[in-house]
Amino acid sequence: MNIRRKNRLWIACAVLAGLALTITLVLYALRSNIDLFYTPGEILYGKRETHQLPEVGQRLRVGGMVMPGSVKRDPDSLKVNFSIYDAEGVVDVTYEGILPDLFREGQGVVVQGELGEKNHVQAKEVLAKHDENYTPPEVEKAMQENHRRPESVYKDKAS
């Protein structure tokens, strides 16, 4: 191999190494800003294809329906505890702040926050469904895939 080819090979290797390093650093920097979307069932059992569970402390968005009878408000503050469900599971959420006007039991919501211990989400933002015709695309897809409710929603409360 002549000297000119060796120099070109070294330059090509250096460019590829620099490109790989740049991509790695960009992905590492963006990792803290990416909020992955999960349903309650995916938090409990993992994503469908990979069965990967979210980690404690991970920022995420959770979409589902507010469980009827689960909304508990603290009388001394703006703290609210409620549960979000889908066909595969239920996740508890804590939020401190003013809830959207359209927030109510049985309605679709998307909460953004951090996953805590025991699959508890500490929400920093709560988004309620806008009107009866609008559903966020991620929530609509997830609800179509599992359009059943957990059995606890159907239990007769009188007995």
UniProtKB/Swiss-Prot annotation:
GO MF term set: heme binding; metal ion binding
Species, as recorded: Citrobacter koseri (strain ATCC BAA-895 / CDC 4225-83 / SGSC4696)
Protein's gene: ccmE
Gene Ontology CC terms: plasma membrane
Gene3D superfamilies found in the cross-reference section: Nucleic acid-binding proteins
Region described as Disordered: 130-159
Subcellular location, record wording: Cell inner membrane
Keywords on record: Cell inner membrane, Cell membrane, Cytochrome c-type biogenesis, Heme, Iron, Membrane, Metal-binding, Signal-anchor, Transmembrane, Transmembrane helix
Residue numbers on the Cytoplasmic membrane side: 1-8
Protein known as: Cytochrome c-type biogenesis protein CcmE
SUPFAM superfamilies: Heme chaperone CcmE (SSF82093)
Periplasmic side: 30-159
